[in-house]
Amino acid sequence: MKCTLRWTITALVLLGICHLARPAYHKKCGRYSYCWIPYDIERDRYDNGDKKCCFCRYAWSPWQCNEEERYEWLRCGMRFYSLCCYTDDDNGNGNGNGNGNGLNYLKSLYGGYGNGNGEFWEEYIDERYDN
C-alpha cells in the first residue's frame, strides 16, 4: 500500500511539472489560429496576421482584460473559453531596425518600442528601449 501511494505521488508530481512547463501552443478555432499562453505567464508573443495570442485568464467580462487585449469567447469542440486576446495592432509599424512604434501594447506597458519584427522581447524592452 505504501509503495503504491509513493508511486501515485511521484506520478502526480511529474504530471504537475509537465503541465506547468508546457509551452504556448496553437489551436485552430474558426478563422484564426490561437496561440495559447498558459497560466498568465509572461513570455514572448507574436501575431503574424492569423495568429492571436491569448492568456487563459478565464475572464468573465471584457473589463478583466487589459487595455491592449480584446475579450473573446472561443468555442473549441464542446467547450467554451473566455479569453483575453492581444489585438491585431500589437506590433505597430516596425521599420526593421527595432523601432516599431508598438502602439498600445508596448507603449502602455513598458513605455518602450517594438523590435520591428513581430516579436516582443521584454528583456530588450526593459534594458534598451525604456528610456
From Swiss-Prot:
Keywords: Disulfide bond, Extracellular matrix, Repeat, Secreted, Signal. One of its GO terms (cellular component) is extracellular region. It comes from the Eukaryota. It is found in: Secreted, Extracellular space, Extracellular matrix. Residues 91-100 are annotated as: 6 X 2 AA tandem repeats of N-G. Residues 1-23 form the signal peptide. Its main location: secreted. Component of conchiolin, the organic matrix of nacre. Expressed at extremely high levels in the dorsal region of the mantle, which region may be responsible for the nacreous layer formation, but only in trace amounts at the mantle edge, which region may be responsible for the prismatic layer formation. Sequence repeats lie at residues 91-92, 93-94, 95-96, 97-98, 99-100, 101-102. May be specifically involved in the formation of the nacreous layer. Heterooligomer; disulfide-linked. Pif97, Pif80, N16 and other proteins form a complex. Belongs to the N16 matrix protein family. This is N16.3 matrix protein.
